[in-house]
Amino acid sequence: MTVKKIALVAHDRMKKELIEWIKKHQNLLKHHELYATGSTGQAIEKTLNVTVTKMESGPLGGDLQLGAKIVNKEIDILIFFWDPLEAQPHDPDVRALLRIAVVWNLPVACNASTADYLLTSPLFDSDYHPETPDYEAYRNRII
């Protein structure tokens, strides 16, 4: 089994759903490196009795800290249970995190069923590395 670096994030009204999902998959998740934003990380530690690398709370920059880890290839999977029914004060940060995950072709799940698909994929236990997009032309563009 290849150890994955998994970022787990949930908006306040979605934390209970994420924790229930984590309980369902705790035997698998406890063998991986887990990262999370503030209070989500605390809840995960309490649930799994494992150490979670905690960022700041989302509104205090935790989403952006995870985004930086994605850019630096320090995260393999993002599981983000975001609340589709409530506006967030840090919505630009949420969009930035999701955008940067797509930019770097990172596997992302935004609900339990998609997260189930990720964890049960045959690629999950392999040494799979998503193809990194080639942004050289963008980096070298003349403005």
UniProtKB/Swiss-Prot annotation:
MF terms (GO), sorted A to Z: methylglyoxal synthase activity
Occurrences of domain MGS-like (ranges): 1-143
InterPro entries per the UniProt record, alphabetical: Methylgl_synth, Methylglyoxal_synth_AS, MGS-like_dom, MGS-like_dom_sf
UniProt keywords, alphabetically: Lyase
Catalytic activity: dihydroxyacetone phosphate = methylglyoxal + phosphate
Active site location: D63 (proton donor/acceptor)
Entry's Gene Ontology cellular component terms: cytosol
GO biological process: methylglyoxal biosynthetic process
EC identifiers of the protein: 4.2.3.3
Chain's role: Catalyzes the formation of methylglyoxal from dihydroxyacetone phosphate.
Name of the protein in its database record: Methylglyoxal synthase
Gene name of this polypeptide: mgsA
